[in-house]
Regions:
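Short Trp-Ser/Thr-centered turn/loop motifs at beta-strand boundaries
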Residues: 115-120
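Extended polysaccharide-engagement surfaces of secreted carbohydrate-active enzymes
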Residues: 365, 370-645
Length: 645
């Protein structure tokens, strides 16, 4: 084997020596608490400065039926002075003051109904947050149109005027026509074929079959509604109505409600029929649909309120179900009295917690594969708010611009992705979903890097994205008239980029050019192994010229499949450290963080700390790790040095 001689200049040598000896360097972030599955302390932390885009007040929930809270916000703790804000009988643990707050110190307290007030907590405001504050939900509700359709489109004539040669239009009609020929699905499952399986196998197959019930019903309705809006052909109306009325007969406590995704899709499918064909349905048909939709919508509200807002992560809720609930309640508004309360909750929780698996820096802690399941939620909800109120969350929240860099560094055009979290090892290139996402974000943010990325993706993967349903109707009906950014972009990508809020970073010799790029992807997540986040803190993957050369192994078939729980979920499947054969804990508490980033034109250095990833009070495990710090050094064009302490 030929050995490469390393010729490093004197000053580079001093830098490297200083880095590894721990000389004082710029430090990233601040100390962080260990996250549990549920919020245990108030937010903002008592006595702290507001660090979010606008003040968001939360407190630990009290479990039980009919729990509610009173909350009071003041400038002092005196009993005889009027409150700035007082809310009573809140059924959940979120308060966003949708009012301008001057710089200074604020005091607040809460009480559970029937109990005493908490002590006062305080937080300080040192910046002007007024421009960031979303509109009050009451203002948003007041702007919801009275008529129908509201959801897929609000101007039928506009949809009929779309060019017949438009590829999205052609794809939708073609897919709808194929479904016209299929028999209607039902909500039963033949369990006799499970006779020779064990209980785990039966449960897995039964859930997969139950998911298909809602999926098939929704898929038909969704495409039939779209095809009708595009063509005006009543054959799509009759089929959509037939499917929607059939779903009203399905028992929510049966197979159609066994899996939350299926349950939510049944709910939204019926709502789409009600909304799209409102003027064509009889009063009896409308009532039948409304009654069935309410059963499922009420169930979800009771399930999530006073729970999911203080939970570190509820994956299905944030991936699709919040979006489905938001859409359904937009349709039901002014038809069902409770939707005012329900929609206010979903509005509040979106603006209090989103993006739930990231932050201002961008990135996504559940990785590349599962980010695709959040794309439509992250785009469609703020788009509706902007359309109704003018409030532009895409411009307010830095996440939306910073995700462009995350795409370049972690889902690189023409190359393999970073490989972290469930199913990301399957991603050998960005594919149609990421192309579609970049195009929409380019239009909505007018940030040129998104256009650059989309163009690069098409250069390496000239796909017909019309065949991918993700964001297709959004693109066709809501942003078709929006221009792409026109500003010229001078590309000067740094050697390293960290997305601390999203749990990943990357060092690359030639980012954006896969044919000559050496990339090392770094993992340091603020949430430990939970959901689709794996026990891979302080691990790394390496690619060269867009191909994997040193990567973790494994795959996921199901959350509980033996290969995942015995291999791919665990540290031993990644380029990490085992302690006497033990990897990192499977717990939200097994966190890691980036501590330093130093870079120039000839080197890049990153330090990350996973000292807390090997113990958890939740799992009652402690593998005795006092310190696990990993140092990464990239010396272009093709030298990587990794040093552990």
């Amino acid at each position: 084997m030929q050995r490469n001689l390393i010729n490093i200049s004197f000053f580079r040598s001093l830098w490297i020596l200083g880095l590894f000896l721990g000389l004082t360097l710029p430090t990233l972030g601040v100390s962080q608490g260990v996250p549990g599955r549920y919020l245990k302390e108030v937010l903002p932390c008592n006595g702290c400065e507001v660090s979010t885009l606008y003040p968001i007040i939360q407190w630990p929930v009290k479990k039980g039926k009919n729990v509610s809270y009173d909350v009071e916000l003041d400038r002092d703790t005196l009993e005889n002075t009027p409150s700035i804000l007082f809310k009573n009988a809140l059924p959940y643990s979120i308060l966003i003051p949708y009012i301008p707050l001057e710089k200074g110190i604020y005091y607040w307290r809460y009480k559970v109904n029937g109990l005493q007030w908490s002590p006062y907590f305080s937080f300080s405001i040192k910046e002007d947050y007024q421009k960031n504050i979303p509109p009050d939900p009451a203002f948003f509700l007041s702007k919801i149109p009275a008529g129908h359709p509201r959801l897929l489109i609000n101007n039928i004539n506009q949809s009929r005027s779309i060019d017949a040669k438009n590829e999205d239009r052609i794809a939708i009609i073609s897919e709808a026509d194929e479904l016209l020929l299929l028999p209607l699905p039902d909500d039963s499952i033949d369990t006799t074929r499970f006779a020779n399986l064990n209980e785990n196998q039966k449960g897995r197959i039964e859930k997969d079959a139950a998911y298909q019930i809602g999926y098939q019903a929704y898929q038909r309705i969704y495409l039939f509604c779209q095809a009708y809006l595009l063509t005006g052909d009543d054959k799509y109306f009759y089929k959509a109505k037939e499917m929607g009325i059939l779903v009203t007969s399905w028992d929510r406590n049966g197979y159609s409600g066994m899996v939350d995704f299926s349950d939510a899709k049944c709910m939204l499918g019926m709502a789409l029929v009600f909304d799209t064909f409102y003027d064509k349905l009889s009063d009896g048909e409308k009532k039948l649909l409304l009654d069935a939709i309410q059963i499922r919508a009420k169930y979800f509200y009771q399930l999530y309120k006073n729970d999911v807002e203080v939970k570190i992560l509820s994956g299905h809720f944030w991936q699709h179900i919040l979006h489905f609930l938001f859409q359904t309640n937009l349709i039901l508004f002014n038809h069902v009295d409770e939707t005012k309360e329900w929609l206010t909750y979903y509005y509040n929780i979106f603006f209090a917690k989103s993006p739930i698996l990231s932050g201002e820096s961008g990135g996504w802690t559940e990785g590349l594969s599962y980010f695709t399941m959040n794309m439509e939620t992250l785009i469609d909800i703020p788009f509706f708010v902007k359309s109704y109120t003018g409030y532009d969350f895409f411009k307010v929240h830095p996440f939306y611009n910073n995700m462009a860099s995350w795409l370049v560094y972690h889902v690189p055009a023409g190359a393999v992705g970073d490989g972290f979290a469930d199913n990301s090892t399957h991603l050998y290139s960005p594919g149609a979903k990421y192309q579609a996402f970049a195009i929409e974000m380019a239009k909505l943010t007018q940030f040129p890097l998104y256009k650059w990325y989309a163009d690069k993706c098409r250069e390496y993967e000239p796909l017909n994205i019309s065949k991918e349903s993700t964001l297709r109707w959004f693109r066709l009906s809501k942003t078709q008239q929006l221009d792409m950014p026109t500003a010229d972009l001078i590309i000067d990508f740094p050697l390293a980029k960290l997305f601390s809020d999203g749990g990943a970073g990357s060092m690359q010799t030639n980012a954006g050019n896969p044919t000559s790029n050496l990339a090392i992807f770094l993992r340091a997540s603020p949430i430990g192994a939970y959901g689709h986040i794996l026990a891979e803190q302080n691990t790394f993957n390496i690619s060269y010229k867009g191909k994997r050369v040193f990567f973790k192994t494994g795959y996921k078939l199901g959350m509980d499949d033996p290969h995942r729980t015995g291999w791919s979920q665990l540290t031993k499947s990644a380029n990490g450290v085992l302690i006497n054969g033990n990897g990192q804990v499977i717990s939200t508490e097994g966190i890691s963080s980036f501590k330093r980033l130093v870079q120039g034109s000839t080197l890049a250095y990153v330090k990350s700390d996973a000292s807390l990833a090997y113990k958890s009070s939740e799992t009652k495990e402690n593998f005795g790790v006092k310190k696990f710090v990993r140092h990464y050094l990239l010396l272009p064009p093709r030298i990587i040095i990794i040093f552990d302490e």
